Curated annotation (Swiss-Prot):
A UniProt-annotated Pfam family: Oxidored_nitro
Reactions accelerated catalytically: N2 + 8 reduced [2Fe-2S]-[ferredoxin] + 16 ATP + 16 H2O = H2 + 8 oxidized [2Fe-2S]-[ferredoxin] + 2 NH4(+) + 16 ADP + 16 phosphate + 6 H(+)
Coiled-coil regions listed: none
InterPro entries for the chain: ChlB/BchB/BchZ, Nase/OxRdtase_comp1, Nase_comp1_CS
Alphabetically ordered keywords of this record: ATP-binding, Iron, Iron-sulfur, Metal-binding, Nitrogen fixation, Nucleotide-binding, Oxidoreductase
Domain of life: Bacteria
Principal EC category: oxidoreductase
Start-end of Basic residues biased regions: 257-271
Protein name: Nitrogenase iron-iron protein beta chain
Subunit structure: Hexamer of two alpha, two beta, and two delta chains.
Family: Belongs to the NifD/NifK/NifE/NifN family.
Details of cofactor binding: Binds 1 [8Fe-7S] cluster per heterodimer.
Amino acid sequence: MTCEVKEKGRVGTINPIFTCQPAGAQFVSIGIKDCIGIVHGGQGCVMFVRLIFSQHYKESFELASSSLHEDGAVFGPCGRVEEAVDVLLSRYPDVKVVPIITTCSTEIIGDDVDGVIKKLNEGLLKEKFPDREVHLIAMHTPSFVGSMISGYDVAVRDVVRHFAKREAPNDKINLLTGWVNPGDVKELKHLLGEMDIEANVLFEIESFDSPHSADGSLVSHGNTHHRGSDRHRQCPTFPEPLRRHQGRRVSAEEIRRSRRSSARPRSHPQYRHLPAEPEEGDGKPIPQSLAHERGVAIDALADLTHMFLAEKRVAIYGAPDLVIGLAEF
């Protein structure tokens, strides 16, 4: 048997890693400590997304599924959610936050996920786990609406609504990083640290770039404690990657605090946007160390541009959070 390789005629690249809303909600869930999300739908709705995360971050992540089958589509799959919550809490005694993430199939069927959560709170949790802190959060993310970008938005909104409380401000700012990499979170923390600004990093993924340890004790888990969302209500909000976050709107409206939005800074070139905004809200001057770092970055760009990029036109595509930061300087 012979094999003939044919080159395709297209000159563009099709990006397969731009999927539906449940992916965004799952990304939020893995950024919360002691949290495992249950995707209420077919197994593929979680397996594909978990594969995306594992291939990109080269780490393993814990996500569960209600494993919806044909009989559930006909007779109703709410019982699968109840069983999934029971099994999950029994197998993982440290789990405290369980988002119930809907999919296209369960939304079309019309499953009353909010009603199931109320039933579980009044029944299973009191009877089988009476002394345990468990938070069940409904996240409605039908796949036929929006994308993984808006799914992240919806999940942020639901977590904020569930946990955050109106209390006295603590003069911190909130940082919603969006679809970024662990190194980006580390860099954003560096910026804030240089400016001596205290911040709550919500749905934090810096630990996804976890080191290899001989005893295997270091694993990748989100670093945002669910009680950290209580503090979310107490402080002004900080510009998150895009200008569309419902979570930003919810927190700002309910606690009457300021909200700002900006493109995510990509490395140092966009320092001209980032430092100005915390300075406006915090009143602290931009340190010379950041001005120096930005100058070095711009100098490196200038050194390369005239050699390789002069009179060139390029197309930048990808997640909006990343593309805006790359292109807008």
